[in-house]
Design a protein with these regions (language model features):
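Short, charged/polar "capping" segments at the starts of alpha-helices
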Residues: 77, 107-114
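Short active-site neighborhood of thiol/selenol oxidoreductases, capturing the structured segment around
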Residues: 59-78, 83-85
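Short loop/turn microsegments at loop-to-beta-strand junctions
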Residues: 65, 149-151
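Structural beta-sheet core signal
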Residues: 68-70, 101-104, 154
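Conserved helix-turn-beta segment immediately C-terminal to the redox Cys motif
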Residues: 82-102
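N-terminal targeting signals for export/organelle localization
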Residues: 1-51
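Thiol-/selenol-based redox modules, centered on thioredoxin-like
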Residues: 154-182
Length: 182
């Protein structure tokens, strides 16, 4: 008799958990806010809208990797973001190949400085945003000045910009967010 009660308790527990969680969801009880350390963009935007030419997209998402990106407007300020991006990629350990690093720039006057900066950080893809539309879109959807701050932003494998990390955010917290996302 004691074993039957124990068996019934084990079998009923998962069903009870599902029922209670469904009721909480139905009646609107949910956690307030998020535990993300990054800042979500005001609206999601897709990178398919940024084309370099009629056939060529700004960046390809065929490989199914997440993208850590930096838009370089000031090579000195962006060097900190590029360094942090490399360190975060290394800290991902076994997930290192699920993320690629990309640097964008549009100011052709900075081309030599940018290429010299990127040479310090191997495995970072450099992409020219010829029209500058990406920077404008980032600026319009962010709460900080993307032109001055040069923060790291995250793009999902489907090409949607998800979030960015304000300068000064603790790298351990950024790494924690990346591990949750990936």
């Amino acid at each position: 008799m004691k074993n039957k009660i124990f068996l019934a308790a084990i079998l009923i527990t998962p069903i009870l958990v599902l029922i209670v969680s469904s009721l909480y969801f139905t009646f609107g009880y949910s956690p307030e806010g998020t535990k993300n350390n990054g800042v979500f963009f005001n609206s999601y935007f897709n990178f398919d809208q940024f084309k370099q030419s009629e056939e060529k997209n700004l960046i390809d998402f065929e490989d199914g990797k997440w993208v850590m990106g930096v838009y370089i407007t000031n090579p000195i300020k962006s060097s900190d973001s590029l360094y942090l991006m490399r360190q975060l990629n290394v800290a991902l350990n076994r997930d290192i190949y699920r993320v690629k690093r990309v640097a964008f720039y549009s100011n052709l006057l900075l081309e030599e400085e940018v290429k010299e900066l990127i040479s310090i950080y191997p495995r970072t893809e450099l992409i020219i945003d010829e029209s500058g539309r990406l920077l404008n879109t980032l600026q319009n959807n962010a709460q900080i000045d993307m032109h001055d701050e040069n923060p790291i932003f995250i793009i999902d494998p489907y090409g949607r910009a998800v979030m960015y990390f304000s300068p000064g955010t603790d790298p351990k917290k950024i790494l924690k967010d990346l591990k949750v996302l990936i």
